[in-house]
Amino acid sequence: MMKTALITGATSGIGHATACEFAKHGINLVICGRRLDRLEIIQEKLQKLTNVHILNFDVRDKAATFKAIDSLPEAFKTIDILINNAGNAHGLDPINEGSLDDWDAMMDINVKGLLYVSKAIIPQMTERKSGHIINIGSSAGKEVYPKGNVYCGSKHAVLAITEGMRMDLNPYGIKVGAVNPGLVETEFSKVRFKGDEIADTVYKGYKALQAEDVAEVIYFVISRPNHVNIADVLMFCTAQASSTILNKSL
């Protein structure tokens, strides 16, 4: 029987690329996001390859998250694979100059949103004693960099939650892992720098990871045999050696 995957943050970047990659392999999709117009365009494109259902909600809204997932039609109710991808970064400021609104946005989406969606899906996985959860973290969850403070904190939390999930869900045979990319050329920087011109320079002078690169790794992780769980992946583009070392001559 073909599996069904629920992907948050599916309207752009890694989430969108993962939906496309999964569709190529015939995995049924529940694509989630805040931008209904984009969800509908993606659904129209991908339903030529597989079955696609859209859920339009904001992971920061606890009630809306549970209501949306509870509304899934019978054909999509059984979620075999959960990709917790929704996340963002706002600002790059020293802690003493940071915006409270930026901090709230990062913690609400990157941490609490991941928890809300997971809480809504995990009970069915424990009941079936099967399932696979992939949390999309970041190299920022492995290494703190200057002015990264709260964003790095949120991504360290994602990795801690992932490890805790893996321990707690091990008795049920549920796989849990994290994929942690470094610099990926997506809308990420435009959101972080609020459309500032700085965002346009982030990916200049080198070849950053593309969303499709990360999506291929995610598919590799979820397509391993039942006895194999890839618990943690850190991936960089060749030009990047760490959060602070980038060779723009490559």
What kind of feature is each model-predicted range?
Residues 25-42:
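Conserved glycine-rich Rossmann-like NAD(P)H-binding loop of the short-chain dehydrogenase/reductase
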Residues 118, 154:
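Active-site helix of classical SDR
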Residues 138:
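Residue(s) in the substrate-gating loop at a strand-loop-helix junction
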Residues 56-67, 100:
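The beta1-alpha1 cofactor-binding region of Rossmann-like NAD(H)/NADP(H)-dependent oxidoreductases
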Residues 11-12:
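Conserved glycine-rich cofactor-binding loop
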Residues 178-179, 197-244:
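C-terminal helical subdomain
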Residues 93-95, 102-105:
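Substrate-binding pocket helix/loop in short-chain dehydrogenase/reductase
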